């Protein structure tokens, strides 16, 4: 079952925690690639100095953040790595959640090929398939083409995991500072990174 539009509404920190344990799905050339979300970061611009929309900054890149919740915000870092975010909060309130890491589930062979251009990989390489925002986008084939796409689409969405299959019973949710935002002054210390403690696919312990 796809997460309905209402799933993405409300407080961004709560939406971030709700995303943990759900499945991010991208259909590429008719093949389903997916992973269970195990690490996220919340960004609450315009008051969050770590957010692209801090101060109400509105550009061609950030325009989608000002739109309806439940859409994809994809951007490039270092000119080469894509990052996938879920837009939250009401229209005009530019907030979102960065998906930082996944546990791969569907389309494993395609994911391996996307990451390493081969399917015969080591255990260490397997652990590195989707344990970072750029890695998971490459693995799932998410690019700037997906910026602004509704997460109600057939090809890109969040799939709700049934309670009896949800991994929240196996891992404790831990909160801590976000990663690689040294420029963000006091926002560096906000505990807005949420992850499953001890999960092997978390990007940073």
Swiss-Prot record:
GO terms for biological process: base-excision repair. GO terms for molecular function: alkylbase DNA N-glycosylase activity; DNA binding. SUPFAM superfamilies: FMT C-terminal domain-like. The keyword DNA damage applies. Keywords: DNA damage, DNA repair, Hydrolase. It comes from the Bacteria. It holds the Pfam family Pur_DNA_glyco. Its EC number is 3.2.2.-. It is an enzyme of class 3 (hydrolase). Gene3D superfamilies: Methylpurine-DNA glycosylase (MPG) (3.10.300.10). Belongs to the DNA glycosylase MPG family. This is Putative 3-methyladenine DNA glycosylase. It comes from Bacillus cereus (strain ATCC 10987 / NRS 248).
């Amino acid at each position: 079952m796809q997460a309905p539009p209402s799933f993405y509404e409300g407080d961004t920190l709560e939406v971030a925690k709700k995303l943990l344990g759900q499945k991010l799905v991208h259909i590429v050339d008719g093949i389903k690639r997916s992973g269970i979300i195990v690490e996220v970061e919340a960004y609450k611009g315009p008051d969050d100095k770590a957010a692209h929309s801090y101060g109400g900054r509105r550009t061609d890149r950030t325009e989608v953040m000002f739109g309806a919740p439940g859409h994809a915000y994809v951007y490039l870092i270092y000119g080469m790595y894509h990052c996938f975010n879920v837009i939250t909060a009401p229209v005009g309130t530019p907030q979102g959640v960065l998906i930082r890491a996944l546990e791969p589930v569907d389309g494993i062979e395609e994911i391996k090929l996307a990451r390493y251009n081969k399917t015969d990989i080591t255990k260490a390489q397997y652990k590195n398939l989707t344990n970072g925002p750029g890695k998971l986008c490459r693995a799932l084939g998410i690019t700037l083409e997906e910026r602004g796409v509704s997460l109600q689409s057939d090809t890109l969405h969040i799939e709700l995991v049934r309670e009896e299959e949800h991994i929240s019973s196996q891992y404790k949710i831990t909160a801590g500072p976000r990663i690689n935002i040294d420029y963000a002054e006091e926002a560096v210390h906000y505990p807005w990174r949420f992850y499953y403690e001890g999960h092997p696919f978390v990007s940073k312990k």
